[in-house]
């Protein structure tokens, strides 16, 4: 066959491959902007490396498992052909551009595999170790993506049922979301993402403008993602219009919902709404009308909002919203293909009723979720057996730019210095590391604050010692006063009893001896004085009790001072 007439279609396929590859830059920008600055380099590097690893794995074996004839009667997996070594087994029979130029088709499909892998990096960001993610991305390109791809696109059992996923709402996006969900569950949430009561806490993005730029890159790349999934022809323009239209209405759907629920246009949800609309239309861009693409886009955006709220309720920490965008919107896209597919196409091409076709679409989405989550969970667990999956608390606090890659940035140095100083592992002078950089004013302010806190701790320790000494002195005085009071009470009581006996004797002799009457008056006066002295002793006891209470308060104050020290 003379390939010359197909060169324009080949050119479009290669351009589309470049556009899909450019989406990698969009994902890099979205994910780097969504995470905190201290983890941005790690996330960016993962996006670069997962392209390398998944591309290599897809080349080595994955492509053949996906597109070669089924190795079993059911259609579960293709025949292994390492390194594209035998193209005669890779569905090269046909007349369209995909089969005439098999290497160009491989290139296009490899970029799709890259997309499925890179979806995962965002969802598990800020806690998954770099090496663990590299191994996971290899597993995706080698087995997980090719197997479901064979079911749906390689002549497998789903394709035989009549399943339709035009450009990958399930094959790429829902699959990536399922693997992400498994990773999120296995890894757990980031520190501080949920409070002690389970309520979600917002972890701010480092750069929403970068996220917005990434979304625009992705929308631009989606022109090739969907437009290149069919041979160049009259339908290409309609496919591209449906694609961008759904992205626009995805954002509109989110804005309407968010304004109704919050009264504030949330930046991250609106941007994810664009992506949700794009994901949803990807399954059906070639078989639905333009008005239907508007509805699908609206539903895709709404799915992002619903999915985000459900993840918060379930306490699942998806750092960038990958599961709502690619998972929830992916399901919407697959099911809506059955609901909105062109009736003529459905009757002539699929030869099914709408109910039958929609049932097949639902079966396909369930199969995708089950395969992606099940195989993904197993992959995460297997990788965890060989290497550590998650960074430690101190590494998470300082950030993965430094803990994983030792990137010495001023902010990273400052953060590390503050963490070490707070933990008592370094002197506050370590902040001088950044004294000459752009963060020098902030570093000096933090250094001064740490030094003031150190001085306050020393002063608190001194006050605790002083209060302890005062407390000891008061305790001694209290004991001495109590002893003296008891001795005085005993002596005064004895004296009072003796005087009372003398009074009784004088009372009997008063009539016989005039002098006794005078002495009796003196005795009565002395009795009154002794009674007054005895009556005053309880007031001394109460005073000593107040001293004891004051001593207790001094104990509390000294303990508080020791705590501040």
Regions found by a protein language model. Give the residues of each.
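Hydrophobic alpha-helical transmembrane bundles of multi-pass membrane proteins
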Residues: 1-423, 428-450
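Long, low-complexity or tandemly repetitive, helically biased scaffold regions used
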Residues: 479, 486, 504-510, 542
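Signal-transmission coiled-coil "S-helix"-like helices
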Residues: 447-450, 454, 531, 538
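HAMP signal relay modules and closely related sensory coiled-coil linkers
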Residues: 389, 407-421, 431-448, 456, ...
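Heptad-repeat coiled-coil amphipathic alpha-helices that mediate oligomerization/assembly
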Residues: 4-11, 15, 519, 526, ...
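Signal-transducing coiled-coil linker
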Residues: 452, 459, 466, 473, ...
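Intrinsically disordered, low-complexity terminal
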Residues: 399, 521, 549, 556-565
